[in-house]
Amino acid sequence: MNKGDAIDFLCEKLNLQPTAVAHVEQIHSGFTNFSFFTELKDGSKYQVRLARKDVPLNRRNEQIILDLVTPIFGNPFVYFDVTAGNAIKKWIEGKQPKRPTRLFLEQLVASLKKVHAVEWKQFANEIWIFDPLIYFNQTKLPDFYKKLYVELTDKHKAIPKTLCHHDSTFDNLVYTPKKQVVLIDFEWSCVDNPYYEIANIIREELTIETANQIIDLYGSLDKKLVFETVIYVLLFAFQWTEIMPQTQQIIDYKKWVQKRLNYFLKALFPNTWKIAKTIPLY
């Protein structure tokens, strides 16, 4: 996908002439889509999302969750193709922070708690209920990690379920000029629990020191279980890379997962690390 594709899509769906577009630039090339910032000559700003065709995603699930969180974050979508996943959204002014301040973490936690409080059970037959074993039998985890993974996921069976963003990394939020955190990109959102939500942010973005801050800010979470969940989420991320097309981007991400797994095991679970360091993920 390129800028021309984004312009063509925007003009087709909004009934514009290409001459109405003043500026377009690619801002993201993710595992599931390409995103472009576009500005029209009248000052209107949009994000164009063009979905990759080789990624298994349930767009109806995304649509349901977008409707559920609209009272929290509003609805920036002006066009959404529930079949293909292509979309046009009004541009949300703000940034993705490079380093998380305490104020940012406070606002992130506040936004996450609002999502976790949303009533979802009326859509229980349609919405994605996360299954940590969804890819388990399709991948090649060494036996040591398989056993560890099952032990860790078993600890989640009795935890109450909530609606979750499930991918609330800094790329998937906007920190607005008013110092509010608006969560965006609900492609992987589902019903799970806050432990996974917080652990996923930690494994993607945070040092152990900053991780302790966000755990304390969220409150009511067992810290040891959160860090165990970081290991679980990293092992899940590896399984996810195994079922994706093996592009260079995925291969590089797989290496990054191994690096982060080493970091957390060595620092927090040294006895497990002594064994794990002799058994690479792949």
From Swiss-Prot:
Gene3D superfamilies from the UniProt entry: 3.90.1200.10, Phosphorylase Kinase, domain 1
InterPro entries, alphabetically? Aminoglycoside_PTrfase (IPR002575), Kinase-like_dom_sf (IPR011009)
Task: Specify the superkingdom.
Answer: Bacteria
| Matches recorded under Pfam families | APH (PF01636)
**Name of the protein described by the UniProt record:** Uncharacterized protein MG356 homolog
Give the classification, highest ranks: Bacteria, Bacillati, Mycoplasmatota, Mycoplasmoidales, Mycoplasmoidaceae
